[in-house]
């Protein structure tokens, strides 16, 4: 029995996943996490550091790390990469001015060795706002079709209304589960 098989068996008992939420500041990471956890979203302030939520969903324990996206904090993102099973990249669909920067930051992340193999979910948030770009437009602008190193999905969501948030997170969890809880 190989080392990876032993690790998978240990993780299978725990049914635990580590999910990292990243994106530029004001993209809606904290709002998404609170909405997903069933918490009120009326008082949210910028994340100056990180939030950790542990919650149960579909029979799994999810350790969700919401890390601040301000430019001054991005150099610290690498401190959170270890043992990440899923990466949720949150995009502000209404912030056309920073889409190029958003794409550049994502490309840097995808080259990180410690994130190799992590499932990627790109959430195009704020779909409820007038003028928000569609998930297809963002997929094109961010060149997501070029990603071959990760399983990925792009989804248009609204953290405020909850639109498509649950189905997107369910996809992420199912994809991670197939990868880390299935013994070959």
From Swiss-Prot:
For this protein's source organism, the top of the classification is: Eukaryota, Metazoa, Ecdysozoa, Arthropoda, Hexapoda
Q: Where is the lipid attached (N-myristoyl glycine)?
A: 2
Please give the CDD domains that the UniProt record associates with this protein. Arl2
Keyword check for Chaperone? no
One GO BP: establishment of mitotic spindle orientation
Task performed by this protein: GTP-binding protein involved in protein trafficking; may modulate vesicle budding and uncoating within the Golgi apparatus.
Molecular function GO labels: GTP binding; GTPase activity
A GO CC annotation given for this chain: cytoplasm
* Protein name as it appears in the record: ADP-ribosylation factor-like protein 2
Q: Which UniProt keywords apply?
A: GTP-binding, Lipoprotein, Myristate, Nucleotide-binding
PANTHER family in the cross-refs: ADP-RIBOSYLATION FACTOR-LIKE PROTEIN 2-RELATED (PTHR45697)
The record lists GTP as bound by 23-30, 66-70, 125-128
> Which Gene3D superfamilies does the entry link to?
P-loop containing nucleotide triphosphate hydrolases
- Entry's family note: Belongs to the small GTPase superfamily. Arf family.
Q: What tissues express this gene product?
A: Ubiquitously expressed.
